Amino acid sequence: MASRGKSETIKLRQNLEEQLDRLMQQLQDLEECREELDGDEYEETKKETLEQLSEFNDSLKKIMSGNMTLIDELGGMQLAIQAAISQAFKTPEVIRMFAKKQPGQLRTRLAELDRDLMVGKLGRDLYTQQKGEILIALQKLGEKLSPEDEAFLSENAGAVFNQFQKVSEGLGSGDKVLALASIEVENTRK
């Protein structure tokens, strides 16, 4: 008992991160295989995955209400789940890196996007969407953006930024996070 639950907390956090990774990978795989699936199959699979995310979010709410030592660590995961549920972010890979607070990997992905656009491997619309998501995630993680990135965000990321702002408003209060999560889950179920 000397650890006062520290090892259990670490194990729980690890299990939660693995489950979040699995769900985000499932969303990413679904998007990558979209062309191979018929419309109904795609929609049904996406709906099931979003339901699993909602259930995971409900579990996080229960854990957060009963174990205050995990609130800070789980808050980031919950925000990422809310962003996925509300579809503020369309790229599961970005959601995963944001949830794990990995600004270095987000910046690497940003460089890959720039390269892919230059060689013609990526269309302008998809580039704009993904770059906007990454820049917003970096900003929310407290990272400093270059003046060029700030300008890109102000020009292109209005809708994504507004949705994400809605999801992350009032994050200072655990009660507000839980209330917002409940609203997002209910909206998803409708």
Swiss-Prot record:
Q: What is this protein called?
A: Protein LZIC
Q: Which organism is it from?
A: Xenopus tropicalis
Similarity section: Belongs to the CTNNBIP1 family.
Return one GO MF term: beta-catenin binding
Q: Does the keyword Zinc apply?
A: no
Highest taxon of source:
Eukaryota
Swiss-Prot/TrEMBL keywords: Coiled coil
Query: What stretch or stretches form a coiled coil here?
Result: 3-63
InterPro entries per the UniProt record, alphabetical = ICAT_dom (IPR009428), ICAT_sf (IPR036911), LZIC (IPR040065)
Q: Does the keyword Phosphoprotein apply?
A: no
